[in-house]
Amino acid sequence: FLPRLFEGVESKMSFVTENVSWWFAKNGQDDDIVLSTKVTLCRNLADFPFIRKMTDDDKQRVDSLIYDAFCQEDYSFFYYDSLSDSAKKVFIDNNILWGNCSSVIINNKDDSISCLTNQSDHLKISVFSAGFECEKAAKKIYALDEKIQEKLQFAASMDFGYLTSNLCNCGSGLKISVRMFI
């Protein structure tokens, strides 16, 4: 099933390697000090165990459900295991992923939105922006989250909020970070 999803990966990879992080070239608030803003949401699908307890079948089903949620939009899909070493390095250098994984990487055209499946949580959504743009990036990620929730049901609790594999990420599942030039 997965190889069929990612036909043409090499042609899409030329986009990633030739046009690295278009969002970074844009101007942002206080961009002489704050180089970039990254807002991340961690989500897990309801009715699936957390990553450490998942079978390979579970992971494929999660990948498939997430693919279905994003395929109507203008995103590119990359299966980590099928990427060349240089393409993996591009994703690592762009702070999209780290280390070895077997994730599916989902990017929009300018790489300002990047998602990973089945790494530490079922879905990790990141929005990148040049400069100090926390509010702008947060609005963008929440809009995407609402759109995805029309198609996917996330694990949540009235007492604890969104459930994640890391207790620090439970609740809103939101993390905001900035990269600064000091």
For the regions a language model picked out, list residue spans one by one.
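Short glycine-/aliphatic-rich beta-strand segments at the starts of folded cytosolic domains
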Residues: 172-182
